[in-house]
Amino acid sequence: MNRKARRCLGHLFLSLGMVYLRIGGFSSVVALGASIICNKIPGLAPRQRAICQSRPDAIIVIGEGSQMGLDECQFQFRNGRWNCSALGERTVFGKELKVGSREAAFTYAIIAAGVAHAITAACTQGNLSDCGCDKEKQGQYHRDEGWKWGGCSADIRYGIGFAKVFVDAREIKQNARTLMNLHNNEAGRKILEENMKLECKCHGVSGSCTTKTCWTTLPQFRELGYVLKDKYNEAVHVEPVRASRNKRPTFLKIKKPLSYRKPMDTDLVYIEKSPNYCEEDPVTGSVGTQGRACNKTAPQASGCDLMCCGRGYNTHQYARVWQCNCKFHWCCYVKCNTCSERTEMYTCK
């Protein structure tokens, strides 16, 4: 059984909230029937199911990219009232907020970037059919800058293109939320593209740099997380502009009187104000902060006063015991003392 394939499949089914199926390798997926597997994945649009059935190898990578985006979201908001969690049905893209808030904007952007990042990485590593290194970045010499393309450049255009077709296919309805979601998807992918790296290697006698070959690589995903968190803090409130004939929204504009200015391509946009995320609310998708750990003395969002929304907090005391001050005695044993520490933990009421 292919251990790497089993691990990949495990990540996929875990991210989908499904039972961990211990099956081995891509051939096992085919044997089970791609249509059976794809029909069991919740929350996919018809176009996405068709892609899943035709490219089951890619759907595994998409699941990993989506989970990478969700993990980064949880890291960036780990100390806030909203910690990238939501109520509702779990899909390949996680549980989704029902309000078109700036938190929803961040979620869509980070997942779109995660899927594009994962697809591009899989192509570079030779783990997907129909793609590989960027063929246009091979051999061309940049005389003015003294280097030429070499190595294996990440084919970010393929990764973004494939991810766009799959991720955007879930936006079926023609309404303002769809326009918002599509804009934030594109913003996440655009920010990924803008943060691609150029790596180079020198060639020459005795360490000289007579010639230099360069190639493009993907950025660390944590770096994208920080960039998108800054975009979240500066998110733009927008509203739809409707066509006069069918009254359907056609594009988004910044929500200001007498203004028809559109947001920038890399802006995160939202159409509704955020709830306070203090209480569990099925209407908004908020899970509330009851039971969340908080910092008694911190003045920031992680502090108990803000995290618990004025409800107060519970104090939990526990003892931590460990071996300490260990010394080697001749001959031949080690003697240690037992150390202990009483610790307090605080959780929101």
From Swiss-Prot:
Residues in the signal sequence: 1-31
Any one GO molecular function term: signaling receptor binding
Effect of G312S: In SS; uncertain significance
Entry-linked Pfam families: wnt
Disulfide bonds: C73-C84, C123-C131, C133-C152, C200-C214, C202-C209, C278-C309, C294-C304, C308-C348, C324-C339, C326-C336, C331-C332
The entry's keywords: Developmental protein, Disease variant, Disulfide bond, Extracellular matrix, Glycoprotein, Lipoprotein, Secreted, Signal, Wnt signaling pathway
SMART domains cross-referenced by the UniProt entry: WNT1
Residue ranges of the region described as Disordered linker: 238-266
Glycosylation site residues: N83, N127, N295
Major place of residence: secreted
Lipidation feature positions (O-palmitoleoyl serine): S206
Function: Ligand for members of the frizzled family of seven transmembrane receptors that functions in the canonical Wnt/beta-catenin signaling pathway. Plays an important role in embryonic development, including dorsal versus ventral patterning during limb development, skeleton development and urogenital tract development. Required for central nervous system (CNS) angiogenesis and blood-brain barrier regulation. Required for normal, sexually dimorphic development of the Mullerian ducts, and for normal fertility in both sexes.
Protein name per the record: Protein Wnt-7a
